[in-house]
Design a protein with these regions (language model features):
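A short, well-structured juxtamembrane/interface segment
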Residues: 1-6
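Asp-based, Mg2+/Mn2+-dependent phosphohydrolase catalytic module
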Residues: 7, 11-14, 18-135
């Protein structure tokens, strides 16, 4: 089961025309099985897995491949992740903004190093609106 407000958040972002992608260290089959099981596949414009890059986060390669596929620059994006040492570090090293998913299993993380810490995924909609001057 997905975390609370995941569908609501992804739907709001997709309706706003926000491009969405997944960067996963999992093999392609495993990543896609999770996405299909959670019925989230229709929200994502790109899914980059270990099979696509041969490198795991925090390597820059999976993040850059995702950005290239989406046609975006790092400063135009926010990466949401639950593992600061891989997700936040990897995204920040190429200039992406970052949000730490505190609503997941944080493994006792106190200081994520992210630009934002999210207690609820729906906070992302508010952050994106603020970043784009909508609110």
């Amino acid at each position: 089961m997905a975390y609370p407000n995941v569908n609501k958040t992804l739907m709001a972002l997709a309706k706003s025309g926000i491009k969405l992608g997944v960067v996963s260290d999992a093999p392609s089959r495993e990543a896609w099985m999770r996405i299909y099981y959670l019925n989230l596949y229709h929200y994502f414009d790109v899914v980059i897995t270990f099979d696509d890059t041969g490198e795991r986060k925090p390597s820059e390669k999976p993040f850059k491949m995702s950005l290239d596929s989406l046609g975006l620059r790092p400063e135009e994006t926010i990466m949401v992740g639950d593992w600061p040492e891989r997700d936040v570090v990897g995204a920040k090293q190429i200039g992406m903004k970052t949000a730490f998913a505190r609503y997941g299993d944080t493994f006792g993380t106190v200081n994520s190093g992210a630009d934002w810490d999210l207690n609820d995924i729906y906070q992302l909609v508010i952050i994106i609106n603020e970043e784009n001057g909508i609110i």
